Amino acid sequence: MDTLMRITDHLTTSPGIQLKIDKRWGASVTFVTRSIAHVRIFDAADPQLDRTWSISLGSNATPRTGLGPRDLLDHSPAPAWAGNSRDVAPVEDMEVTTTVTASAEDTASHPEFSGVYADEPVDSPDPDEKSFIVGTDSLRVIIRDCPLRMTWQRRADDWVTASEDRPTGAYEIGTHTGRVAHHRVRNIDDRYYGLGEKSGDLERTGRIFDMRCLDALGYDAGSTDPLYKHVPFLMTRTANGAFGIFYDNLSASRFNLGAEVDNYHRPFTSWQADHGDIDYWVMTADHLCDLTPQILRLTGNPAFLPRWALGYSGSTMHYTDAPDASCQLLKFIDLLREHAIPCDSFQLSSGYTTIGSRRYVFTWDRDKFSQPTDTTRHFRDAGLHLAANIKPALLTTHPYYRDVAEAGIFVTNSRTGEPATSMFWGGHGGNVDFINPRGVQWWKDNVRHQLIDMGIESTWNDNNEYELWSEDAICDGFGHPVELDRIRPVQALLMSRASFEAQREAAPVERPFLISRSGPLGLQRYVQTWSGDNSTSWRTLKYNTRMGVGMSMSGLVNFGHDVGGFAGTARPGPELFARWVANGVMHPRFTIHSWHNDGSVNEPWMYPEITDIVREMIRLRYRLIPFLYTLSYLAAERREPIVNPVFSLDDTLHEESDDFLLGHDLLVASVVEKGQTTRTVTLPHVSDGWFEFDTGVHHDPGTVTLEAPLDRLPLLVRAGAGIPQCELPAPSGEIITTRTVENSPHRIVLYLPDGNGHSQGFFFDDDGHTNGYRQGHGYWLTWSADHTDTTVIVHTHVEGDYQPSWGTMAFALRPGDERAIKVVADAAQD
């Protein structure tokens, strides 16, 4: 590849600067906000891909600071189906200044141009070297050439360097291969995070990661790479704060985060992609976790899913693969009642589509389901929702294959004009092209007629990695053909969007719930996701937990894992399953799923000796749904992740941990090691320490050891917090669902420190399934508590016109707190 060297022309613009490099390459730096900038480097005569599907930064996508109905985000419109222009205009009023320095001598007079290393291994200064300072009052870039390189600085007390390109060559383009690369300096204290769904530890330093989407059945959560999703968002913790870089390139790529060394270069990191242009976004912050709201602002707010999405969702391949699939499914409802297991939905695996031994999307196996609507009605009558598995490929033996091929709906072989086929679930098949209006419409029609009309209200978008590796595979591109290799993850994104729109068109008032396994950043605008087909082991439990925190930090905030492990030789033993359920109930998505070699099934009641434990863990989740629902609202409307690393509260806790936070108030200390009955936890340094959730016992920040028998999940509440909960009815023959939660008494349990103090908090509720809250039909409650040694006085303030069926919010004190409590309701506001 060729290294980009000299700036041969430039033009200053109001939001940045445009450059000509080596008389051939175009480059631009555009500041879209005070703290987010966009860099493009491309062939000026022939940009490789002039569209983006990931960026969703509208003119009204400004942050909000309040918590009331007037503080809702003005959501940005989704990118056009055909993609948006990569030239994004600023969305904030700001001044961008440019300083031009024409020579190396002048450059030397500016101390802010000094690199990280005083002895940079470059040739003697070129008298014609050009340099520029471009930026806002918060973020700026220093651009130099010979070779082309950039240094990013953020304003702290003074300007400090956040990231520096490699001075011995930063940008490379393969004029024959089409590959591109970007190299940056790696400082000794830099630590790397992000990249979405990745195996191993939360910190990525010292590893190499592939960014490709694969169907990684039974992967090792500690080491397998790549996995299912395309999230090229790298977060760096530096001595001068946090730096984020998002590569808006959808081809297969590779990150070297310090695994490579080269005598001719200082320590460096690299990003390299097979195709496309060098197109990236930079952002800075004081702390690592402050980057997450910024990447969400850039790529789109998380969908606000219906309340029932927080309930337990049953699933297994076994039921729908069985010859008596309908009976197996109906038996599941009976077993929920028999064992008093709360539940809200069931995910229908693809066995409902079989004809013989093969699976054909958008068909029903009438031997298993003579009347599909009879089965779906039983679930609806039980208060349970159904989500059906759908896959974006049709085997060549599919009854619709010929018609779909003739309609030009598949990804095409550019040489033959025929469908480009690939291996897919027991045969070769064609892949639906969602960058094609005919493919989108065909998909939406079939979701409506084959699923929704049959009583299925949600879709489970699966096996959408598009492992079609022919270099001749080409997509319609909405009239502008584009090679699949350049945009592969977009297919999963637009598949999810097509399913989303089909569901919304069928039920315009409802907030759609759907799931997708694969896709790029931007996926969070439509779906919930999960970590794919994991395997049954203690190792998976441990590393899926870390994987999930990494996904959340990277912007995929609504996620979960297959509890019990999807793949493996057999189901988990009782101890592992109990610990996995305890871990799973504390994630945004809680699903028990399986497809084991021995035909066994992961079910809540599969071990009678621990069924009571499993039931109580699931009931604990349902008690906490008011808390989880508030966190879901804050994710959608404040871009606050539901799951956070413990170092989001304490910058000294960057060592690897099996703990995580729900919001910023509840610390989850899962047991992930076999045979453990105690759990050692390092508590973040916060004012007044922490309380055990169930006992009210207080702990100062620092390391503590907690009792963790099999029936106990150690949970700790930040002192001063209030945890919204509901009071569930006793177990009975009726299935507890989130509708039960909506009709059960609510209370906020205050975990206040002893003595004098002041605390405050927030709670949100609405009807749980529509967007009426955006017109004020919600319940926004803020509370403040003033406390002494003997009394607690709580002031509440409610906005919105929603009248919850659970009545008036009650307040209670943590276990062991005997102070008198008084609640004073302030006058409501319209």
What are these regions (language model features)?
Residues 127-129, 135-137, 227-230, 236-242, ...:
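Short, well-ordered loop/turn elements at secondary-structure boundaries
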Residues 210-213, 227-230, 329-330, 440, ...:
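Short, hydrophobic/amphipathic alpha-helical packing segments
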Residues 161-162, 216-236, 533-558, 566, ...:
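Internal mixed beta-strand/loop scaffold within catalytic domains of large alpha/beta enzymes
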Residues 54, 155, 342-614, 650, ...:
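Aromatic- and carboxylate-enriched substrate-binding clefts and catalytic-loop regions
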Residues 305-317, 420-431:
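N-terminal small/glycine-rich loop or linker at the start of catalytic domains
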